[in-house]
Amino acid sequence: MITLAVDAMGGDQGLAVTVPGATAFLQAHPDVRLIMTGDETQLRQALTAAGAPMERIDICHTTQVVGMDESPQSALKNKKDSSMRVAINQVKEGKAQAAVSAGNTGALMATARFVLKTIPGIERPAIAKFLPSDTDHVTLALDLGANVDCTPEQLAQFAVIGSELVHALHPQKGQPRVGLVNVGTEDIKGTDTVKQTYKLLQNSKLNFIGNIESNGILYGEADVVVADGFVGNVMLKTIEGAVKFMSGAIRREFQSNLFNKLAAVAALPALKGLKNKLDPRKFNGAILLGLRGIVIKSHGGTDETGFRYALEEAYHEAKSAGLSKIEQGVAEQLAALETAKAVQNENADGL
């Protein structure tokens, strides 16, 4: 039995989204129990109204909620009994294999890092997410917004934890291909930080394939793509915006005249397949990667379907136990990175 902790009060709409999303998820997974944290009276009423299977839900009463615009410092200092904090505590205490929250990203990252700590050798956690491609291939992208300013060493650490996670989840595919997001594929391009990161990764034991431009990510050119949080977040929001634009443009075009409406009827199966493939809700649920525990961040503005998919992500991560398998591999890869850094420094001193 898999047990997931759910911050029921987090997100833009709170219980209106988390409860129906959790109910649909439980109906699809009889092997799951949920610990839902939040106001017990409100939670029980919402769960009963949704027809949730109460025999597989434990309610953990909390008295506080972290606001969507609340600072991480305030959440850490003043919201120790928040639904977010208590959900993460369930993972720390071994009562749940993963926690899911649609709450304030900064507060969630700060709280999770404080409660769970990071994997030894990893300075900062990163927001990581699996992105679709034009095939059945998926690519893990990180960092998507947690750390807007990174050192080369931190970017290299992101590459390590991303590579180790993908390898743990798909060992049959061999060593994951790691790409560094840049403005061009040539190693002379990019900021000084990116150039130094390139050299570190080039001399590491990772399967580093070099720089990758953002327009190649959705074509499955790499299994792991690494960027700082500023670049990664802009990249992610651009992809999401492009998908929404394309979906809307196709819909408007087919509705523009009678002939196109008739054509839409004939193309309906293909359109449904395309809509299903591009539905951003299916890829809701980002991993706070680098922590000693599984925490999944749902988009704060998602609907019940999107929240269900965030729970699906937590379920698959917990069931695969991928994160529990990576610490040894991370330690070995970080040791190789230190060697690469030492060689790089020696070469620089010799110039």
Swiss-Prot record:
Pfam assignment, any one: FA_synthesis
Entry EC no(s): 2.3.1.274
Tagged with keyword Lipid metabolism: yes
Catalytically driven reaction(s): a fatty acyl-[ACP] + phosphate = an acyl phosphate + holo-[ACP]
Keywords: Cytoplasm, Lipid biosynthesis, Lipid metabolism, Phospholipid biosynthesis, Phospholipid metabolism, Transferase
One GO location term (cellular component): cytoplasm
Domain of life: Bacteria
Keyword set includes Lipoprotein: no
Subcellular location per the Swiss-Prot or TrEMBL entry: Cytoplasm
GO molecular function, one term: phosphate:acyl-[acyl carrier protein] acyltransferase activity
GO biological process: fatty acid biosynthetic process; phospholipid biosynthetic process
Top-level enzyme category: transferase
InterPro entries named among the record's database cross-references: FA_synthesis (IPR003664), Phospholipid_synth_PlsX-like (IPR012281)
Alphabetized SUPFAM superfamilies for the sequence: Isocitrate/Isopropylmalate dehydrogenase-like (SSF53659)
Pathway annotation: Lipid metabolism; phospholipid metabolism
Protein family (similarity comment): Belongs to the PlsX family.
Subunit structure, interactors included: Homodimer. Probably interacts with PlsY.
Protein name: Phosphate acyltransferase
Species assigned in the record: Neisseria meningitidis serogroup C / serotype 2a (strain ATCC 700532 / DSM 15464 / FAM18)
Lineage: Bacteria, Pseudomonadati, Pseudomonadota, Betaproteobacteria, Neisseriales
